[in-house]
Amino acid sequence: MVLNHSHIVRLYLIKVMCQLLGMNCNTPTDIVFSFEGFRRRAGLTDCHSDGFGIAFFEGRGVRIFRDNQAASLSPIADCIKQYNIKSLNVIAHIRKATQGEVNIENTHPFIREIWGQNWVFAHNGNLKNLPDMTDHFLQPIGSTDSEAAFCYMAEYLKNTFRKKPSEMEIFEAIQKVTKGLAQHGTFNFILSNGEWMIAHCSTNLHYVMRKAPFGKAHRIDDDGVIDFSYYAKAGDKVNIITTFPLTKNESWTKMENGGFVFFKNGEKIAEVIGTPKEAIDDGTLGNRTINSAI
């Protein structure tokens, strides 16, 4: 479903846990405009105040920032605007804790090595009764269901392929392991190895694809405005993936339950269409009022 300003809209209240933000593009790009709106949801326009993190891929390396303070107040979050870091793949997360204490080790995104590459993962949801990993090689450092699920996924991939397989083999394997993990609860996530970005939706995830002709974008959370035509070149392509739309005048695509998207170099190279499903309130807090189509 594509959401845009030409639709008839209504306001409604949604309960969510954490929120996710990802960016994949074909030229190094900063995420400041999107992140400045996103971080306001950590205590100002929403209640995701239990820490934040953001990871930038730089070649084969990853520059990662985390804080157990709310992103809206964190001086570490201020650095993102000041330093204007550019990257091809970025993953950010603001936390509303469901499992695990509020501390650095439980703050997303999480990072693991797979086939000699850094893999970065952030999750929105609540997973219960995950498989026991006591005897597994990869262990979570913190106490979140999210990190445990990522470790399970990473170990599954390493056990399935001794050497790095093709991208489509990776995509298919991630679909398979995700379907099993999603049986344990809500499993929205964004995942990247610096070459591509994969997103999976259980309940709420949206994306927008920006390319020429570029125009103005108006943020939802603080009415900030940017004219991308001043900054972007004709061949630039940028995908933004997030829990809820960050702008009110762009055409956002809503993913459905069980849906996957695979982005690389600013292009959507593969997609699995999900099935519309009514969201079930599992008791977690995090109320969000947004515009949506009817």
From Swiss-Prot:
PANTHER family: GLUTAMINE AMIDOTRANSFERASE, GLUTAMINE AMIDOTRANSFERASE YAFJ-RELATED. Its EC number is 2.4.2.-. It comes from Haemophilus influenzae (strain ATCC 51907 / DSM 11121 / KW20 / Rd). It is an enzyme of class 2 (transferase). InterPro entries: EgtC-like (IPR026869), GATase_2_dom (IPR017932), Ntn_hydrolases_N (IPR029055). Keywords: Glutamine amidotransferase, Transferase. Residues 18-266 form the Glutamine amidotransferase type-2 domain. Disulfide bonds: none annotated. Pfam families: GATase_4 (PF13230). This is Putative glutamine amidotransferase HI_1037. One of its GO terms (molecular function) is transferase activity. The active site is at 18. The keyword Transferase applies. SUPFAM superfamilies: N-terminal nucleophile aminohydrolases (Ntn hydrolases).
